Amino acid sequence: MKNVKQEAPASKGRHLILGIFGILLALSGLFLAVAGTRLITLGGSWYYLLAGLGMLGSGVLYIRRKPAATGIMALVMVATVAWALWEVGFTFWPMVPRLAPFLVIGLLASLLHPWLTQGRQRAASYTGSAVFAALLAVGANALFTPHGVLEGKPLPVAQPGTDIPQEQVADWSHYGSNPAGTRYSALDQITKDNVDQLQVAWTYRTGEIAEGASEYQNTPIQVGNTVYTCTPTSKVIALDADSGEQRWMFDPKPHNIKTWNRCRGVSYYEPAKVEHPLVFTDLKPAATAQAGVCARRIVQVTMDARLLEIDAQTGKPCEDFGDKGAVDLTQGLGKVMENVPYYAYTSAPTVSRNLIILGGWVFDGRSTDEPSGVVRAFSADTGELVWAWDLGNPAITKLPPEGQTYTRSTPNMWSSPAFDDELGLVYLPTGNQQPDFWGGARPELTEKYSSAVVALDMATGRERWTFQTAHHDIWDYDVASQPALYDVPDGKGGKIPALIQLTKRGQIFMLDRRTGQPIADVIEKSVPQAHAAGDWVAKTQPYSVGMPTFGAQPLTEKDMWGATFFDQLMCRIDFKKLNYHGEFTAPSTEDTLIYPGYYGGFNWGGAAIDEKSGYLFVNDIRIPQVVKLVPRDNVDLSHLKSGHGVGSTYPMDGTPFVIDHKSFNSPLGIPCQSPPWGVFAAVDLKTRKQVWERPAGTVEDAVINGVRAKLPIPLGMPTLGGGAVTGSGIVFYAGTQDYYLRALDMATGKELWKGRLPVGGQATPMTYRSPETGRQYVVIVAGGARQSPDRGDYVIAYALPEKE
């Protein structure tokens, strides 16, 4: 009998490990090869097929324990490095899914190679292992370093930390700090040198947690020693500016509020301080109020469309305003309810002189028969209607004739206007006409007002000029940001009164606010001409080539991203399947990519301007969207009658289609294009050049498919809200996906400090100095980051430590 040589247990274990590694490698290669073949049929890159075949072959050789397995894998890795450099150069985040998996494979292959060679080449293998381990360590460390940073140059700040005389301290009495909407405060007690000493001075909790689609996005205002805030369901709260203690709360008890509850701000009116009140001969005179009663007023609009005035001192309704303190805003609108409100108010009302100027929010994507986008002005003293601007019928200047309504479904103004008291103009950022993604039935008269900036005469409500930012908008490119007013150099030693308008397209338009003519060059460019049946598209669209553009570069297959090469490949396949020919590719019956997406670019947070340096501060969103027009005959409409839609479907009643829409995400639930998905940035309005940029926030608190990241990796996340800038050269911002209030150097963009919040914030911070203690505070509302499961009801004030 022959002796049978028994295989050593150690050898069996090694063979098993080699086999498992080979199987995993072969399966990965098979996936890449099969999916890569599909990509090729769509006109995409050949890399994945070739790399997949190489990995498949190497995996089979590992299973068979052949030394050539390592060599083939090495060739695949060398080719991958060359391909990655050719596609994206040395840009870090695009490199991650291309190279990181191969660094792991390379490390394992180096460690396993001696088992294929019976111990030969052990030294070389371990050297290779060390190299791959070092590269992985360097790469892992680089994950926590901001990339794509453009750093600005320091600017001198004159006499920081000085005490501005109290009579020169302006209250933060408007939503955007001032009528110009610059979100600027001259306060400089908190400086770049001491901002790292900020601590929580007080915290107030409203007791109301926003649920469902509701959000707590409020920016408080401050007048004297009182801070005023409002909750998503329209409660108004007055707080002591030094202690945060509640002075009063007013609950208007709105009815039938089931969705989209928001209150981004309240406004302030003090009749005695109006310098140039408008005189209205056809209105009844203001009632003579009891001395001290409603001498100072808080103006609020509820989610059920009531305009209110409340005594700023007591929190009680001002009985001489409207009907015992309230005006019904649904008058003249026609039908506004169908299970859910089709008309509401989410932004702060605008108080200009002795007027309250209002637009309104309408439910996107529902119908061609939605409430009017009429803009109205009411007497801040009596609540009477002073004028109305009906975009579809200029003949209506107050209430519509009996039995009629304001023109239905005209473009609306749901954001915040700015106003120039000297010019007597109010500037309206308008939305696009309903229903957002199909415009075949839109009247010609109202087309020019869609997604535009419109200047109205403050006294009469008559149009002075209009500038459109997107022609025949069928992409939901509402002008969401409040206009910012600032005087820019004319190059001749003088100044031009400018209006700076951010848009969802990532374009920044700089206009002469007297005439609406561009100051920075704007040109019309040709855009794709295909469109859905019954609709049409404009031949050209306006591009602000005289100002920097953010996040608006056309996407290509190379821009697709993923956490691994698997989901990156799937994103590339999905991208090639989409109907996309660049910006302004019109929605169609195919899946159509919209980029910049309809969240932005720049959304409702708006810009901040340092009035000393002329720096403009912005934050954006870079998330593509996918839409599809579905013929109405192919859809079960019974699901859509409530007006809520099903999932990501809107009914668009009155059109031939319903609309499906969603974010363009990978199978792992992350955006398909490379980071950053949101940035902070600054533009010098004098030179019209970008001066700095940095990714906005980290994934630390992001929840993806139910898993919390918990890693402060600064990918640059989508942003909401806006920034506030101080006279000491600090920009405060909190609208990131992670839970921090940040302080940035306005000149360089460098992060100076960040304070941890209990939940995320979507609101714009504000700052003020207490007239009682002289202490400067920075206040932020933390109600929860967008799409975060963590909700809150916090109003938090930060300040420097009190002096002993």
Task: Describe each PLM feature range.
Residues A418, Q541, V545-Q625, D633-V635, ...:
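Long, low-complexity segments enriched in small/aliphatic residues
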Residues V104-T117, R122-T145, L150, A238-Q246, ...:
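Hydrophobic or amphipathic alpha-helical targeting/insertion segments
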Residues K2-K153:
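Topology signature of small-to-medium multi-pass alpha-helical membrane proteins
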Residues W172-G176, A213-T233, W260-R306, P341-T368, ...:
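Repeat-blade elements of multi-bladed beta-propeller folds
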Residues N194-G207, V236-W260, Y268-H276, F280, ...:
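Extracytoplasmic/lumenal domain signature
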Residues S185-V195, V200-Y228, P252-K253, F280-T288, ...:
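Asp/Glu-centered strand-loop micro-motifs enriched in Gly/Pro and often flanked by an aromatic residue
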Residues S129, V138-A186, Q541-F566:
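N-terminal pre-domain segments of enzymes
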Residues P179-A186, E208-A213, I237, D436-F437, ...:
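Short, solvent-exposed loop/turn elements at domain surfaces
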